[in-house]
Swiss-Prot record:
Domain of life: Bacteria
Keyword match Transmembrane helix: no
UniProt cross-references to Pfam families, sorted A to Z: Guanylate_kin
Stated name of the protein: Guanylate kinase
Organism name: Deinococcus geothermalis (strain DSM 11300 / CIP 105573 / AG-3a)
Record-annotated Guanylate kinase-like domain positions: 22-200
Length: 242
């Protein structure tokens, strides 16, 4: 990590341009890790298509239908599955989640970056379907103790369901090398800078290196520090045991 390095925000001319297909950035991680807050800060002011997932779970206090999720009945969701209308879909803690395909393909084709915030199982489906086009970013908790505190603080889950989420989080953390990037969300400002760097670096790599600006090179340098390959199995085990 290089918390002192400043990276310019992605240029709107590179994040929404018809000359290149847009980036497909998939943000995933354990429930309670802070994906929503991080995503809002990262994407503020950007012309990025944020895909709103469908779900069959009940809305939490403050969540808005069509903004945070599209809340549907199981019957409506399963009909969409039968129509092959999801890029990915998964069942998590008894509820269905899915990402509709058509709006994503349309945004990518017009050169607009697309961001998905989805469950890990769904992220792996996107990786299988889209290959290297999908830029997978795993958001890591600083520790399991901190993740437990965040989940408990929600006051929306039973103790049994929290334990299920924590066990799943352990498994997901140990599989972090399946993702291209891993960002530890222990400092919101730093995590936002790292996401901005990843986005700019991936755009830079679509062009010859001779065309890179100084800001592009700084972004590539910072993005390399959050590659999943930087983490050892021992690093992941320490977080799981913490």
């Amino acid at each position: 990590m290089l918390p002192s390095m400043m990276v310019a925000r992605p240029d709107p001319q590179t994040t929404s341009s018809s000359s290149h297909r847009g980036l497909l950035i998939v943000m995933t991680g354990a429930s309670g890790v802070g994906k929503g807050t991080l995503r809002e800060r990262w994407l503020a002011g950007q012309d990025v298509f944020y895909s709103t997932s469908w779900t069959t779970r009940e809305a939490r206090p403050g969540e808005r239908d069509g903004v945070d999720y599209v809340f549907v009945t199981p019957e409506v969701f399963l009909e969409k599955v039968r129509q092959n209308g999801f890029l990915e879909h998964a069942q998590f803690v008894g509820n269905h989640y899915g990402t509709p395909t058509e709006p994503i393909e349309a945004a990518l084709a017009r050169g607009q970056d697309v961001v998905l915030e989805i469950e890990v199982e769904g992220a792996m489906q996107v990786k299988e379907r889209m290959g290297e086009e999908a830029v997978l970013v795993f958001i890591m908790p600083p520790s399991l103790t901190e993740l437990r505190r965040r989940l408990t603080g929600r006051a929306t889950e039973t103790p049994e369901r929290i334990e299920k989420r924590l066990q799943r989080a352990r498994d997901e953390i140990m599989a972090a090398h399946a993702f291209r990037y891993v960002i530890v969300n222990d400092d919101l400002d730093r995590a936002v800078r790292e996401l901005q760097a990843v986005q700019r670096a991936e755009h830079a790599r679509q062009r010859p290196e001779t065309e890179w600006t100084a800001e592009d090179r700084a972004a590539v340098q910072l993005a390399e520090t959050v590659r999943s390959t930087v983490l050892t199995t021992e690093d992941l085990q320490r977080i799981v045991n913490s």
